[in-house]
Amino acid sequence: MTVRVAVAGASGYAGGELLRLLLSHPEVEIGALTAGGNAGSELGAHHPNLLPLADRVLADTTTAQLSGHDVVFLALPHGHSAAIAAELGDDTVVIDCGADHRLNDPTDWARWYGGEHPGTWPYGIPELPGLRERLTGARRVAVPGCFPTVSSLTIAPALAAGLVDPEVVVVAVTGTSGAGRALKPHLLSAEVMGSASVYGVGGAHRHTPELIQNLSAAGGEPVRVSFTPVLAPMARGILATCSAALRADTDAEAVRKVYLDAYGDEPFVHVLPEGTWPQTSATLGANTVHLQVTVDDDAGRLVAVGAVDNLTKGTAGAAVQCMNLALGLPETTGLPLVGVAP
């Protein structure tokens, strides 16, 4: 089986990570590579690590360039994917790495992104209950945001098992690549190095409604979420600490069993040995989530911690995982399980 693939937004971080993974995928042939303002330049000017594709010239992102492929990945800013996807036929699998098709509620879309709701596609966290079945054979897929990916997988089992109250606190430390490649003063090395800072405080981050949507589905009831992202001086990775009040006396061993039961058969989600806590460095370049969970007896709260590479399992790896499901390939095909360390 040979799958011809196009990547729109190939000059960005997500597009580059997609291409890194696709180069190692045994069933993929890489076709059109497109970009916006960087059209006309060679890919190697943006991703010198991608030597096999370095001399490929980036085309304009148009339907004509993207048509005729089996799979099209859209690694574009929010608001740009829907119009392009609408012009691609159902014979093409379209996988959107942006936000356009993640949210179910048009009101949420209008509040957080503005404009008309582009519609909802099957949502790309196969490890959450019921989602793998929707992704199998899908022709359209919405890749989740990086924060909702790790945070949802970190706390969802506790909500699904009824262990905790439906009020969750999430504090997630992230690297700078999550903000994309565009030049921003607060991401300059002089501003970031040697410092950590919060942003999107007080429920202001756009991933908040997506996280609420996921956790409410997992818990079977509305869940309130207080989400605070923290920018750290590292290029990639997210470490999410999620906590919620326990509904009854429960010890760490019982909680751990819930997580092991939830993820015991999942190839990409690893509940670490007892006493070992996740660290972002162990997930770099891998399509994996590392988890640990315990109980704070004095506070009466469950505390769960998850680590992920925001560019791999947090974006591009999830996109390839969903492509595999959509095409009926083994889910792990072409996806690394081993991170890069140190």
UniProtKB/Swiss-Prot annotation:
One of its GO terms (cellular component) is cytoplasm. The lineage of its organism: Bacteria, Bacillati, Actinomycetota, Actinomycetes, Pseudonocardiales. Pathway: Amino-acid biosynthesis; L-arginine biosynthesis; N(2)-acetyl-L-ornithine from L-glutamate: step 3/4. CDD domains: AGPR_1_actinobacAGPR_like (cd24148), AGPR_1_C (cd23934). Pfam families: Semialdhyde_dh, Semialdhyde_dhC_1. It comes from Saccharopolyspora erythraea (strain ATCC 11635 / DSM 40517 / JCM 4748 / NBRC 13426 / NCIMB 8594 / NRRL 2338). InterPro entries: AGPR_AS, AGPR_type-1, NAD(P)-bd_dom_sf, NAGSA_dehydrogenase, Semialdehyde_DH_NAD-bd. Catalyzes the NADPH-dependent reduction of N-acetyl-5-glutamyl phosphate to yield N-acetyl-L-glutamate 5-semialdehyde. Keywords: Amino-acid biosynthesis, Arginine biosynthesis, Cytoplasm, NADP, Oxidoreductase. It comes from the Bacteria. Belongs to the NAGSA dehydrogenase family. Type 1 subfamily. It is found in: Cytoplasm. This is N-acetyl-gamma-glutamyl-phosphate reductase. The active site is at 146. Its EC number is 1.2.1.38.
